């Protein structure tokens, strides 16, 4: 029951990834990743090891990237740093709010694949918010479709595709299929 948990403690147990990365522009990649572990009182050696481990996880060489600043990174690199910053303190829950919405399609597909790999290997719960149905179907073990604040369907991707529960879900999937056939 989360209502019994101190709100600050609760928030520190959630990793957040947002659309525009939210990286601190005046801090290096290493310091951005180290923020929450430092707040939690981790020692310097543990933080440094975790920063390097996480950069390796997303294929960013620590020797090359730890001292760079966000402005020196591509959009995809910034998203990778934003993702590992959220993972830095090993939260049980990850909240990802349209993290891949502002990057090109090739980088987006690559990041989606990386996220799937990380999710499979982490054992953590990921809540991923997106307006892209294809992305939801690719990344979700369960997909929640909401229209005007009302739940339309909550199901595994295969079930959602096979048995849309409402006219809205049917139309949403049909629009997505039309876009996919058109190459968009």
Where are these predicted regions, by residue range?
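ABC ATPase "signature
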Residues: 154-155, 163
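Conserved ABC ATPase "signature" region
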Residues: 45-64, 117
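Conserved ABC ATPase signature
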Residues: 68-73, 77
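Catalytic Walker B motif of ABC-type/P-loop ATPase nucleotide-binding domains
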Residues: 94-97
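Conserved catalytic motifs of ABC-family nucleotide-binding domains
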Residues: 90
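Short helical segment in ABC ATPase nucleotide-binding domains corresponding to the A-loop/adjacent helical element
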Residues: 30-38, 48, 52
């Amino acid at each position: 029951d989360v209502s019994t948990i101190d709100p600050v403690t609760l928030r520190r147990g959630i990793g957040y990834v947002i659309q525009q990365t939210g990286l601190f522009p005046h801090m290096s990649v290493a310091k951005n990743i180290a923020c929450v572990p430092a707040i939690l009182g981790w020692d310097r050696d543990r933080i440094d090891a975790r920063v390097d481990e996480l950069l390796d996880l997303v294929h960013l060489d620590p020797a090359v990237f730890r001292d760079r600043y966000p402005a020196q990174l591509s959009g995809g690199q910034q998203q990778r740093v934003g993702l590992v910053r959220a993972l830095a303190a090993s939260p049980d829950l990850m909240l990802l709010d349209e993290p891949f919405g502002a990057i090109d399609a090739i980088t987006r597909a690559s990041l989606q694949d990386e996220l799937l790999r990380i999710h499979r290997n982490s054992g953590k719960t990921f809540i991923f918010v997106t307006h892209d149905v294809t992305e939801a179907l690719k990344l979700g073990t369960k997909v929640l479709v909401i229209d005007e604040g009302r739940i339309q369907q909550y199901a595994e991707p295969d079930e959602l595709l096979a048995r849309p529960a409402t006219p809205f879900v049917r139309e949403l999937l049909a629009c997505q299929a039309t876009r996919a056939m058109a190459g968009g």
